[in-house]
Structures are given as C-alpha cells and as structure tokens.
Amino acid sequence: ETMVRAAQLHRLTGEAAFLDWAAGQMDFYAANFLLWEPQRPGHPARLFWQTLTEATNLVKFADVCRLLAGAVEAERRERWRRELLEPEVRALNSTQQQVHNIALWQRCAVAQVALAVGDEAMWRGAIDGPWGVRRQVAEGVTSDYFWYEQSLGYNAYVAQALLSLGTAAGLAGRADELSHELAVAQNLLLSPLLLRFPDGRLPNPADSRGAARAPDPEVLARSYRVFPTTLGLEEAVRVRDWNTLLDPPPAPPRVGRSPRSR
C-alpha cells in the first residue's frame, strides 16, 4: 500500500524521491521473488500464505508498474515483468480452476497485470479463458444477483475484485469490454437490500465475520467511480483521497417524491 502511495505521489508532485523509493521496492521484489520458497509445499504462493492474498496484492504491484510507466526505463520495467509479475501470473493461473470467489479475484488480478504490461494474450486468457472473468460472473452470480457461495459478504467481496479491474480497464480505455460484468457487479452491491431486516441487518447464512447491514455506505462510496449510486455519491463527496482528487464525485441526483407521497 505504501508503495502505491509513493508512486501516486510521484505522479502528483514529480518528486524524484517518491519515484526512487517505489521503483526500488519493485526492484527488490523482482530480484528476490523467485528466490523465496513457496509458503507451503504444493502451493505456489510465495509472498503470502495463499494465492488469494497474492492476488489481492498483485493488483498493487500492477498499479505501481502503471503509475511509473513513463518515468522508468523500459529495461527496468521489463525486469519487473519477467522476474515478478509474470511468475505471479503463472502461480495464480495454476490454481483455482473452478468458479469461486478466489478464482475471480485471481483472474481479475491477472487481467490488471495484462493491462499494466500491455500483454493482449494474457488479457484474453484472464477475461475469456476457460475459468476467466466472464465465466466467473456468468456462472457465479444467480439470476437475482447473489454470489452462489451463499455468504452475503461475498457479494461485496467479489464486487470489489471487479471494481479494481473496472477501474484499471477504464484507465486503459477498455471498460466497455466489461460492461456486462460491471453492471452485474453493481447489482451485487445492491441486491442485499432486498433481504435486510427492518433494522437494516442482514441474515448471516454462511462465511462472515458478523452480522452486516444494508446498505453499506462505505463500500458504495469506495465504488463510486465504477458503480455510481446515489448513496455512494453522497458519501464520496465527504471523502478526501486519491480517487476523489482525480475524479471528484458529481453531486448525487435528487430523489423526488412520488405523487402519492405528496
């Protein structure tokens, strides 16, 4: 996370110190990644205990690579690709050959690496491959927009994977290729409203840390750039972060009253 912030600050300020630190971190991981043993026998994860955590952090490495693209020489970026990003992609592609929330995260992470390094074949495999993003969404989301693994918390979790991918695809001018999948993801964030109890709490049928509530203003605010909602925009206008600096949220639409309520 700090590496991403340093890369962002370099883009914002042009200060070489931020560039040197972020690029130095990428150099370190590239130089050592293949020297580190996998965390567990028979599992390819090297930086973390499981490939899910590798995936959720790989998107940060990909973002740093994108942010520094115009400031780092091509040979250095190629070393990052060859010695860090591509080995991570191979590790993620070797597991989770199924429709699953972890598989979706892993394919989304690989797709973001593909965008960062300009690898069309990698992109096509992550999106349209046998266990790619399209199949994950087509088979993993029910007709009433719930993730099939029966945890309501997974709705937001897989939507966050697609939010990360949608943001990267939008920056690369390729969000239109994912228009259906992103629309489904937005509905994943909204569908729990249909199941909430009168006090806003949600049922907890499966894997969850505790009783959640709907709507979740924080999640909707984080998602406004790709999944704009009235409540999300209302929350986002009060936030000061990288997203709202680059893409200030518009005023939310007014919610008019129906004639019967007047």
Regions found by a protein language model. Name each.
Residues 1-186, 196:
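Aromatic-lined, polymer-binding surfaces characteristic
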Residues 111, 153-262:
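Carbohydrate-active enzyme catalytic cores, enriched for enzymes
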